Amino acid sequence: VALGYVGVLTMRLEMPWVGNLKEKRALVRPVVERLKVRFPLTVARLDGLDAHDWEVIGVATISNDYGWVKETLKMAADYVASEGPYRVTSEETEITMIGEGDLDEDELED
């Protein structure tokens, strides 16, 4: 039995019409900050920080409930896709089981 689940979502955001880093940050930073407030997630800008027309963001969460992790990451992905004038060109979700817990009698009955 798993103690919990760690979920990670990465998304590549592309904005080929953007001409400089300042303009790109003005598009990406607000959605990153809103994700942190709206969902129980850790959010980071992972790649493309020096590129003016694309960036990869990552989000992570942890819980003892697999379904909750999966749904939270899906809601975060949908939110990012709907929020910006950028295009989401790739999205990857990975959920990993962590640890092993002890079974109790209640779990055996489920």
Each predicted region: which residue ranges?
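Short, highly charged C-terminal tails/helix-capping segments
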Residues: L49-W54, T93-E107
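Short, charge-patterned binding micro-sites
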Residues: A44-N64
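N-terminal first-folded block
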Residues: A2-R38
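A short linear hydrophobic-aromatic micro-motif
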Residues: P40-D47, S90
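SAM-dependent methyltransferases
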Residues: A2, L108-D110
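Short, charge-dense linear interaction motifs
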Residues: K74, E107-L108
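A structural signal for short, well-ordered beta-strand segments
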Residues: L9-L13, I57-V59, E91-T93
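C-terminal structural segments of small proteins and small subunits
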Residues: D65-D102
